[in-house]
């Protein structure tokens, strides 16, 4: 059939659109850290649980790669252009889409508190079964082949997601 495709393997999307009209609103219990952070800051949740502080990381908490949703959207556009322009090298390609840098749970909490001037109520609890120590993207191939890289900082992402959460609370 001569069908070409590209799969984007993204890591942890965070942030909100700059208009603050689009953001993450999980129904029920969130499955990601950032909604727990914002909902705790907004008073929707009493306390944020940090699962494990005994990992072999800089502060003992798990590490993940957090990518802004706008950077993620731009990666999709870059992949589509590659297909439209027929510059793909194989009929099926895949790319890691992330920042290439890991941030620990406590780094996320501390950065969120700092950039938004708010204190979070959190506690350290035991590890969750199945959680890995660290997961972050090697974006070397995506950077080169898609001519794409992230532009939005963790700080900007955490500011935007808090602005979005506050708008939901109004």
Language-model segments: which ranges?
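C-terminal substrate-binding subdomain of Rossmann-fold SDR/epimerase-dehydratase oxidoreductases
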Residues: 33-170
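Hydrophobic, Gly/Ser/Ala-rich alpha-helical and linker tracts in large acyl-processing enzymes
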Residues: 17-30, 37-40, 46
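Conserved beta-loop-beta element that borders a ligand/cofactor-binding pocket
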Residues: 1-19, 47-51, 89-90
């Amino acid at each position: 059939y001569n069908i070409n495709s590209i799969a984007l393997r993204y890591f942890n999307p965070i942030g909100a659109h700059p208009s603050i009209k689009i953001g993450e609103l999980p129904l029920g219990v969130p499955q990601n850290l950032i909604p727990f952070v914002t909902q705790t800051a907004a008073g929707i949740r009493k306390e944020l649980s940090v699962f494990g502080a005994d990992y072999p990381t800089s502060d003992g908490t798990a590490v993940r790669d957090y990518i802004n949703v706008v950077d993620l959207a731009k990666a999709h556009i870059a992949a589509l252009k590659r297909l439209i322009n027929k510059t793909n090298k194989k009929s099926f390609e895949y790319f890691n889409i992330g920042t290439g840098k890991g941030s620990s749970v406590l780094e996320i909490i501390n950065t969120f508190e700092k950039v938004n001037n708010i204190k979070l109520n959190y506690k350290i609890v035991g590890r969750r079964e199945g959680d890995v120590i660290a997961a972050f993207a090697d974006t070397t191939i995506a950077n080169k082949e898609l001519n794409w890289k992230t532009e939005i900082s963790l700080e900007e992402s955490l500011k935007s997601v808090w602005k979005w959460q506050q708008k939901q609370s109004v």
